[in-house]
Amino acid sequence: MVAGDQNADPVDGDSRPGAINQLLDNRRVNTSRTPTSAGGPEASRLQGQANESHRSPARYDTADFGDAIGSSGNMRGHVLPSRNLRIEDSGIFWPRQADPLSRLTGVYPFPSSDHRLVWVDVTLPHRR
């Protein structure tokens, strides 16, 4: 399992070209499910600007950075299980503004962080 804030959007990022793809494309990594949120698309629509030029869907965004035209992508955090782990569920904790829990993520200036929690539930393989 690889988890953390890699600050590497595979489509709209400004990190070293192809760096995160080396991990995402590795045969030992289970990428069968990409976590999503309801709040990412809402924030993208409300903020516009750079979000309008991003090629990856906003439902995959894991951070809410500055939206100046030309700024890099918002898929920054990753949770990547090993291929031998079955993904049961996944998501990004980024509720819509109407959700009472949105007070935990909020809008700028954020009450917590500009990064959102990425989570994956997996089933461990049976040990022999």
List PLM regions with ranges.
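Metal-dependent phosphoester-hydrolase catalytic domains
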Residues: M1, Q6-R128
